Amino acid sequence: MTAETLIASLQLSMPELILAVGAMALLMIGVFSGERATPTVTGLAVAVLIIAGLWLVLKTGEGEAYGGAFLSDPFAKFMKVLALIGSITVMVMTVGHARSAQIDRFEFPVLLVLATLGMLLMISANDLISLYLSLELQSLALYVVAAINRDSVRSTEAGLKYFVLGALSSGMMLYGMSLVYGFTGHTGFDEIAAALTAEGRSLGLVFGLVFILAGLAFKISAVPFHMWTPDVYEGAPTPVTAFFAAGPKVAAISILVRIVINAFEPVVADWQQIIVFISIASMLLGSFAAIGQRNIKRLMAYSSIGHMGYALVGLAAGSMAGVRGVILYMLIYMVMTLGTFACILAMRRREGEHVEGIDDLAGLSQTNPFMATVLTILMFSLAGIPPLAGFFAKYFVFVAAIEAQLYGLAIIGVLASVVGAYYYLRVIKVMWFEEPRGEFARTAGELRLVFGLSGLFVLGYVLIGGPLGTAAEAAARTFF
């Protein structure tokens, strides 16, 4: 690698370098900041993420870096912006709640920055080795974050479960990568696609593909690799759960799209069957398993499993319309989920106790009409009721599936959506038609800002959907 190519590579990966250097600097600042360490480091972490985002949007060009292992293209840029917005939002949500959520440690924002760095590298990965390294960087930070509340048995259990199952999924994925490398002789996505076109598929290669897809399905908590999700969502502190539900899902879906559309495009018939099965299983389990839930964080866990199933409908189509649908679905899903978790974080009694039961929302329309109204809008949107953003998200992926002649998949998706609407409507019924059980403490300004903006986005998507759709189409065109 010459000096010129190295400089060009560094310029393309500047947002990632900003996060890497920023994380190391924040660690040093945290050590020497004394009692004010957590708010100081959290504020600076938000600033680092914003600087990286601005550099990404305004300065970063397009092209390959580090010998083709890193790729900067419109798709990567769009998904990186989503991941950064998710991370910044979670940081803002935790500013006033670190102590009450018992995550009052300066390492927390540093670990979130490192996890975000892993996400950005993952989205730009164009090689199996760079994919694995970035995935592990993200995962190792998240294992610690899940168990960061050492005084809570639930949090420690969540971290341990996530670590054991995450290590297993990483091992499966690595084994799949070794099979793909063994049968093609390459680790780069473009070279793998070229080898598959020239030589055709073999049984060993299909096994490798299955193991890689299984590892990534774990990261997006798709069935049958979803077992960790309800326990980790319930056990981890609420800001951590909000983080899990946003950025990492965006990054994992992004690399899943890049692998199947780019590297394994010549064997579309093989991976399409796998994606269709995972999608149907996730939609059905997400819809039916959530019906009996009494804890709102567990409900959101099953909701996220179902939503990943809907997102995979677009990927199964394998077309430009399908990829565009996936991109828009992840954008809308992230906004709805972060808004909902801001409301969950605001579920705090006057005595300071955080509550998570759906029944604790009883009579919220009388005690906090603004929060009840926003949460109602978000629940309707998650259920896919028109004309809210959630309806358009599902519409785009179902239309792509119909255009790809996957009629059965689209029909099952619509039916699962109808079943799923029940448990969202149950939350609305509890808020508006039951007597209050007590008032929540005054909602913090940053939480009101987050769920207010997300409610506004969901309501106003019908007006701003055009430019977002154009941007998503430009990102999807990267592959076609």
UniProtKB/Swiss-Prot annotation:
Keywords assigned: Cell inner membrane, Cell membrane, Membrane, NAD, Quinone, Translocase, Transmembrane, Transmembrane helix, Transport, Ubiquinone
Membrane topology per record: Multi-pass membrane protein
Residues annotated as transmembrane: 12-32, 38-58, 78-98, 106-126, 128-148, 163-183, 203-223, 241-261, 271-291, 303-323, 326-346, 372-392, 396-416, 449-469
EC number: 7.1.1.-
A Gene Ontology BP annotation from the UniProt entry: ATP synthesis coupled electron transport
GO molecular function: NADH dehydrogenase (ubiquinone) activity; NADH:ubiquinone reductase (non-electrogenic) activity; quinone binding
Subcellular location per the Swiss-Prot or TrEMBL entry: Cell inner membrane
Catalytic activity: a quinone + NADH + 5 H(+)(in) = a quinol + NAD(+) + 4 H(+)(out)
Stored HAMAP family: NDH1_NuoN_1
Record's subunit section: NDH-1 is composed of 14 different subunits. Subunits NuoA, H, J, K, L, M, N constitute the membrane sector of the complex.
Family, similarity comment: Belongs to the complex I subunit 2 family.
Protein name: NADH-quinone oxidoreductase subunit N 1
Source organism of the structure: Rhizobium meliloti (strain 1021)
Taxonomic lineage of the native organism: Bacteria, Pseudomonadati, Pseudomonadota, Alphaproteobacteria, Hyphomicrobiales
GN (gene name): nuoN1
